């Protein structure tokens, strides 16, 4: 009979088969009431899951991240049940958990309105009050297909046909609603009390623009109403900070329908910021011992066959183009190009480590439904770098990468982050000894830097372990930007070599790394982090000079010219408008400093200084203000605020 081992090492013995719920009840009534499910050998299961043999068990409650996933998964089914109750002609398709919530796609040609969402949410709450038990059922493939076809759910029948034959078919039933799902789910609808439907959007079936357009209803769910309220507040903040709206308001960038989705046009103000970022990036990389590269945008398809991209990355690549009976491929990554430069001649151990960096434009095939402003695009510039080194040099190179990465992120105002170390997966390439040495080098570098990190056992790529850094923005969202990835695969595929001290030839270790990731995506994160109020060193216009009347035009021109000659990004506003109107307009443009020139300033050869927060800093000499601005611009990572 089963002996159940709990996370603290304690054990519970039973003389008959039990469920996860039974174990929780044996521990105590409080845990039984809180239990949402269990975790066995890394797999989430329902609270009704039978335990017939000795096993290790973790009881999952709403306090666990896994519990939150169960809640959200169950809310997706609750949403589908409510839609079917109100709109029986709608067909259900898929409803997964996503970050901070869930969605469900419906085939419903009429489309859902905001009023429909209110009615659906009200129905969901009604179903919660009914306290419907949730049960798992196993069906044969034929039974499941027959059931859903009788219900008129053709999409579900299609999904079942795509499930591997060795997988069991499980359904979940609550009340008169049944859905196809692996689970797990909460034991009762009464456990779902803190949720909100947020929006409706279009989505193609299976993400393919050639398929039917579906209606996607998004929602969020949390353990309690307090957490839900906090999230909805963050959501309001996120909407205010939406980079697409701010980008249009400040004329930073656009995506033109005539050119196609996911292709970014940088406007003059956005291009200024990009140039500042690129110059800073190149300066810091040069100081860290990197050499800059430029590589082509296309290459023979054979190159991508050698690198393995056509085998492992084909779905993210565009179709090849033909010229003179030769197929060419747009590059999805820069790595093979850097390898070709390395292969240009035989390398000596004395040359290693080699550090090469490139702001290289790459192209990824993305479904139109997945595109999102600057955050998900088809053509973007990667801040790529590759290091070729010996095994014993790995740790020092990782230390250097971490120094450079954290310094650069701090300069952009990001000093809070999460770090993950991902280790060898079950399927991998390369000798076990090198994997162990490389993983230990990554771990040791993180430890020497005193950085907190989580270990994702088995989460590395098949070709090497990696470090991922997620930055946290002003409203607490996490963004994956920086990556350090060891690669034992490409050196083998390209037969890369260097001549060692003893004259023998060896494979170099290859390290891929990105600090910012995609420039486009990082710019989108910056816009939302600062709400368009960029720090002075990044602002496209750092100071605007405004005259009150045309009597001050000559002096205003002198002031603006002096600013420009000092290297500041300045703007001159001599329009025949009221000064209050000008000030309000430039505050809306988020310009850090506003200089007002009136008769008094002309007479005293001063400037009246204001900030974009309407703070009046008083009159200053031009030299004093330029010194003030110089100090501000030099303070990387600092931004002026309402308190300054």
UniProtKB/Swiss-Prot annotation:
Any GO BP: threonyl-tRNA aminoacylation
Stretches assigned to the TGS domain: 1-61
GO molecular function: ATP binding; metal ion binding; threonine-tRNA ligase activity; tRNA binding
Transmembrane annotation, as ranges: none
Keyword annotations from UniProtKB, A to Z: Aminoacyl-tRNA synthetase, ATP-binding, Cytoplasm, Ligase, Metal-binding, Nucleotide-binding, Protein biosynthesis, RNA-binding, tRNA-binding, Zinc
Subcellular location: Cytoplasm
Location of region: Catalytic: 242-535
GO CC terms, sorted: cytoplasm
EC number(s) reported in the record: 6.1.1.3
Binding site for Zn(2+): 335, 386, 512
Catalytic activity line of the entry: tRNA(Thr) + L-threonine + ATP = L-threonyl-tRNA(Thr) + AMP + diphosphate + H(+)
Note accompanying the cofactor annotation: Binds 1 zinc ion per subunit.
Homology family: Belongs to the class-II aminoacyl-tRNA synthetase family.
Subunit structure: Homodimer.
PANTHER family, alphabetized: THREONINE--TRNA LIGASE, CHLOROPLASTIC_MITOCHONDRIAL 2, THREONINE-TRNA LIGASE
NCBIfam families the record matches: thrS
Function: Catalyzes the attachment of threonine to tRNA(Thr) in a two-step reaction: L-threonine is first activated by ATP to form Thr-AMP and then transferred to the acceptor end of tRNA(Thr). Also edits incorrectly charged L-seryl-tRNA(Thr).
Protein name: Threonine--tRNA ligase
The species this protein was found in: Nitrosococcus oceani (strain ATCC 19707 / BCRC 17464 / JCM 30415 / NCIMB 11848 / C-107)
Gene: thrS
